[in-house]
Each structure stands twice: as structure tokens, then as C-alpha cells.
Amino acid sequence: MGVTQRGREFPGEFADVLIAAQAGEPLALRELFDWLSPAVAGFLRSRGAHDPDGSANEVFLRAFRTIQTFSGDDQRLRTWVFTITRNLLIDERRAAARRVELVFDDGRAPGREPRGDAEADALIALRDERVAELLAHLSPDQREVIALRVIADLSVDQVAAITGRGYEAVKALHRRGIAALRRAIEREGVPR
């Protein structure tokens, strides 16, 4: 029986894939990457990472460098990977505070070139902008918990382990964050 992630079955038996990944098998590493990378990139995007896809790749580089030290099941692996993700985001924010960023005349930062499909790029930018606007109504703690619970699809226990908060504190932040989002949407309406 495979492990499911939002309706997507984990390919193979987790224990077998983990053993192969720990031995450095490229296909096993790819299976783990394919299983978790959309949620990692989504979390990074929701938290305002400068280059979510590049940062997600860095998360997996860090994780795969030390995967042989990991022990646990699939949910423990998700928690471990999202702990790495959160730490990377903190590191990037600290580094960003110490550097000056170059910006092109058209407002793009280096590394943020269009992908070639202007319509798709525009829709992605609008969606990301709308999500960022809604998340701006939340406290930083609520934003983090909502991103981990909803976008990364982690359990309350996993979010508590990643953030170092108690179970009840995570539940309260999640509940208050959802209520604040609901109020913001009701106030502003849903764009058509």
C-alpha cells in the first residue's frame, strides 16, 4: 500500500524508497523530490520567498546531503523537510537584510525572467499577488501556520514540531488565521 499525499499515491513502499534514497539512488531521490517539492515550493511562495523554485531546490540539496541520518516514516520525513524549508527561509531573510538587490529597468530582479508565456506569467503573478494580499491581513505567526497547514498540508503535530510551538497554540493560530482570512475576503469581496 502506498502513502497518499493530497490524493496522490506515493510511488512504491516508503521504507524501500527511503533505503534507496539513503544509498544515493537517483530514482529514489527523484521520487521523494517529486512527492514533496510542490508543497515545499508552495509554502515558500506563500511566505514571500524571492525565488521559490530555486529555494525549493536548495531545500532538497540540504535534505539529500544528510538523508542517510534520517530515520522515520513518511510523515516524519515531511516534518523534517519542512523544518529545513523553514530554516532556509529564515536564513534567506537574514541574508536579504544584509544585501542590496539589483533590479532591471522593467522592475524584474535578476533570475526572475519571464518563462516565455506572457499570459501564464501574468496569471501566476496575479494569483500570487492576491494570495499575498490576503495573507498580509494575518500576523506573521498566523501566516506561517496557515502556510504550513494549508499550503504544505501538514498536520497540527507536524507544524508544532517545525515551529517549536505547542499543539494548542498551533490550533489557535490556525483558527484565528482562517477567521481573519474569512473577514478579509468578506470585506474585500472575491475578484472576478
Regions flagged by a language model, labelled:
Residues 2-4, 8, 161-162, 178-192:
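C-terminal edge and immediately downstream basic/flexible tail or linker adjoining helix-turn-helix-like DNA-binding
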Residues 3-7, 22-30, 41-58, 167, ...:
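Short, charged helix-capping/linker segments at alpha-helix termini
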Residues 7-14, 91, 99-124, 128:
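Internal acidic/polar
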Residues 12, 18-42, 133:
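A short, charge-rich alpha-helical start-of-domain segment used by transcription regulators
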Residues 33-50, 66, 135, 180, ...:
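Amphipathic, Lys/Arg- and hydrophobic-enriched alpha-helical face
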Residues 46, 65-72, 83-104, 124:
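Arg/Lys-rich amphipathic alpha helix in sigma70-family domain 2
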Residues 133-136, 140-144, 152-169:
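Helix-turn-helix DNA-binding module
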